[in-house]
Amino acid sequence: IMQPSPPHEAWEYTVEHIAINAVMAGARPEYLPVIIAAMECLTEESTFTHMMSSEGSFTLAIMVSGPIARELKMNSGVGLLGHGWRANNTIGRAVRLSLINIGYLWPGEIDMALIGRPSSHTFYTFAENLEQSPWETFNVGLGYKPEDSCVTVDTVMGGIGMRIYGGGVVEPWDVKQVLDSIV
């Protein structure tokens, strides 16, 4: 049984609950360890509470590093956030369905994003590009061995350049506006 941190400790979930949502998402059984690892990451208060209850349009980035990404045929290159990549899409979708069905994360109730969350159906789920990266792998940078697989979940701004005002009014920004606000 896994329990999220405050204020979400009122609900708890099991691997069975996650597996049910994974099946609904169309995930293959071999994806389950990655989905469970992502859900375990979300039990940390700093990730879960901030992103999920924010009025900003943050979204989750779920990065898989290590050999499991290749085994699951996750995309780490061109189009990695696009359609057609079953592992990427269904892992992210299983996490999202788990948050909705187990954590009751309904828009306008707990999920308060004013304009929604980009990629909220699948989040930004991708594999680290081990073949083309000139740097050491992310999992090695965290102190793991190259043969270890890791799942990292973090919040990212939804990839849009907009200011959000009360009531959902938005305004696009440009570089000059950003620099003017700094100066």
Residue ranges of each PLM-predicted region?
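N-terminal core-entry segment
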Residues: I1-M74, G79
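A structural signal for small-residue-enriched, beta-sheet-centric alpha/beta enzyme cores
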Residues: T59, S65-M74, H83-G92, R96-V183
